[in-house]
C-alpha cells in the first residue's frame, strides 16, 4: 500500500455540491428486518427527488445482487458487506449526492465504523425502532417464521442480537403514525440542519 497515493481531482465535493445546489449527506437507516427501513427511506427519496434533489438509495437486499453477491451471512461476511456499502456511500457523498442507506447493520461497532468515514455533519443515523413484535407480525419476507423454526441461523432479533443506537440523530417507530408524518419528520430535521435550504423546503411543504 505504500506505493499507492490518493489522486486529487480538479473537481472536488464542494464544486459538485454547488453544481447540484444541495448539501451532500448520508442518511443511515438501521433497524430490525421488517421495521420499515426501506419503505421509509424510499418515501423520503421520492419526496426529495420530486423536489429536485439528486439522490440515491442503497438497499440491503439490492446490493447483494451485485456489489456483494459473493458474500454470505456469517459475521465476517456481514461486516464486509457493510464495509463495502460504507465505501460506496462515501463515493456517492463525494459526488455531491444525498444518499440514503437501508441496512439492518445490527452492531454499534459497524455503524460507528461507517460514521467515522464522514464529517459529523454528513452522517445522519436514523434508528427505525419498530418493536420486534411488530416486525415479526409483519414478516414481509417470511424470514421470522424461518428463523423461529431454525431454518435460518444468526437471524437478527431472534438468534442474533441487535444493538440499538445510543445516540441516533433521529428515531422513528413506523408502527406509530403514518408514513407521510414520518417522512415529514425527516424533512423537518434535514431542513433544521440546513441539508435542505429554505427555497427547496418550500417545494417539500
From Swiss-Prot:
InterPro entries: APS_kinase, P-loop_NTPase
Gene Ontology terms for molecular function: adenylylsulfate kinase activity; ATP binding
Record-level GO BP terms: hydrogen sulfide biosynthetic process; sulfate assimilation
Pathway as given in its UniProt record: Sulfur metabolism; hydrogen sulfide biosynthesis; sulfite from sulfate: step 2/3
Catalysed reactions, as listed in the record: adenosine 5'-phosphosulfate + ATP = 3'-phosphoadenylyl sulfate + ADP + H(+)
Entry keyword Repeat: no
EC number: 2.7.1.25
Xref: SUPFAM superfamilies: P-loop containing nucleoside triphosphate hydrolases
Residues that coordinate or bind ATP: 31-38
UniProt function note: Catalyzes the synthesis of activated sulfate.
PANTHER family in UniProt: ADENYLYL-SULFATE KINASE 1, CHLOROPLASTIC, BIFUNCTIONAL 3'-PHOSPHOADENOSINE 5'-PHOSPHOSULFATE SYNTHASE
Family of the protein in this entry: Belongs to the APS kinase family.
HAMAP family reported for this sequence: Adenylyl_sulf_kinase
Protein name in the entry: Adenylyl-sulfate kinase
Lineage, top ranks: Bacteria, Pseudomonadati, Pseudomonadota, Gammaproteobacteria, Alteromonadales
